[in-house]
UniProtKB/Swiss-Prot annotation:
GO terms for molecular function: metal ion binding; UDP-3-O-acyl-N-acetylglucosamine deacetylase activity. Keywords: Hydrolase, Lipid A biosynthesis, Lipid biosynthesis, Lipid metabolism, Metal-binding, Zinc. The active site is at H264. It comes from Chlamydia felis (strain Fe/C-56) (Chlamydophila felis). InterPro entries: Ribosomal_Su5_D2-typ_SF, UDP-acyl_GlcNac_deAcase, UDP-acyl_GlcNac_deAcase_C, UDP-acyl_N-AcGlcN_deAcase_N. Its EC number is 3.5.1.108. Pathway: Glycolipid biosynthesis; lipid IV(A) biosynthesis; lipid IV(A) from (3R)-3-hydroxytetradecanoyl-[acyl-carrier-protein] and UDP-N-acetyl-alpha-D-glucosamine: step 2/6. Zn(2+) binds at H79, H237, D241. One of its GO terms (biological process) is lipid A biosynthetic process. Pfam families: LpxC (PF03331). This is UDP-3-O-acyl-N-acetylglucosamine deacetylase.
Length: 280
């Protein structure tokens, strides 16, 4: 059975910023936690319930991933969760003073900086690294995801945006390690199509969106502060989102994930199927 030592943070760290969808400023605090705590969210502005970062607590997947417990809700957790998962951090208390995690620059970069500032502490207890008993898949319309037994965590993603010549069809495949995530995936920002913006605003979303935290694709060009960080930054960001969503399985696992056009809803659906087939 594969296993490794559990890990937490060495010290408490803070970050203040705005949420991309609700546009509210909030302070985020990451705190060390005891062994076998898991990743747990608290709303520091409420005397509410603890919100474990687990699939049963997912309550909304519209343009981001939202968790809830009782009356407590915390939105847009995926970029933070991707950073924690890829850094092999098992136990941490996350406190947020609003209903949405601050977006930073739209990537996982700020959360990797927080983890570096806090430092990582190895704990005494171990955690098993689970494997898939058999392949699983999820499909709906033009979206397809599958997970195959593998001895490492690998993600292969195909993104197809025929409505955007600048994005077009992109494909990337990475073995996910702390190093590969930090260098190849964490800097990649969230993005939207220009013709989606009115629709999103009409739904009360992206109130905190701006060119400091997102890339907008318009016709055959981009609207951004500076150039793309990678020529295929959109597909890399989709891999970032997928890592964050699948971290809600709540257990370290290895598999080869193949995804075509997936989003938060389908990522979570695959996560539930993976959880059913993990061993031990």
């Amino acid at each position: 059975m594969l296993e490794r030592a559990q890990r937490t943070l060495k010290r408490k760290v803070h970050y203040s910023g705005v949420g991309i969808h609700f546009g509210k400023s909030a302070t985020l605090t990451l705190e060390p936690a005891e062994e076998n705590t898991g990743i747990v969210f608290y709303r520091s502005d409420l005397l509410g319930d603890r919100i474990p970062a687990l699939l049963p607590h997912v309550c909304n997947t519209g343009r981001s991933t939202t968790l809830s417990s009782g009356d407590s809700v915390i939105a847009t957790v995926e970029h933070l969760m991707a950073a924690l998962r890829s850094s092999n951090i098992d136990n941490v208390i996350v406190r947020c003073g609003e209903e949405e995690i601050p977006i930073g620059d739209g990537s996982s970069h700020v959360f990797m900086q927080l983890i570096d500032e806090a430092g990582i502490c190895t704990q005494n207890d171990t955690v098993p690294i689970a494997k898939l008993a058999r392949p699983v898949y999820y499909q709906t319309q033009d979206t397809f995801l599958a997970a195959f037994p593998c001895d490492e965590l690998k993600i292969s993603y195909t993104l197809h945006y025929p409505q955007s010549p600048t994005i077009g069809t992109q494909y990337r495949s990475f073995v996910i390690t702390e190093e590969s995530f930090r260098k190849e995936i964490a800097p990649c920002r969230t993005f939207a199509l220009y013709n989606e913006l009115c629709f999103l605003m009409d739904r009360g979303l992206i109130r905190g969106g701006c060119l400091e935290n997102a890339v907008v694709f318009k016709d055959d060009g981009i609207i951004s502060l500076g150039q793309l960080r990678f020529p295929d930054e959109p597909v890399r960001h989709k891999i970032l989102d997928l890592i964050g969503d699948l971290s809600l399985v709540g257990r370290p696992f290895v598999a080869h994930i193949v995804a075509v056009g997936s989003g938060h809803s389908s990522n979570i659906a695959l996560g539930r199927k993976i959880l059913e087939e993990l061993q031990p």
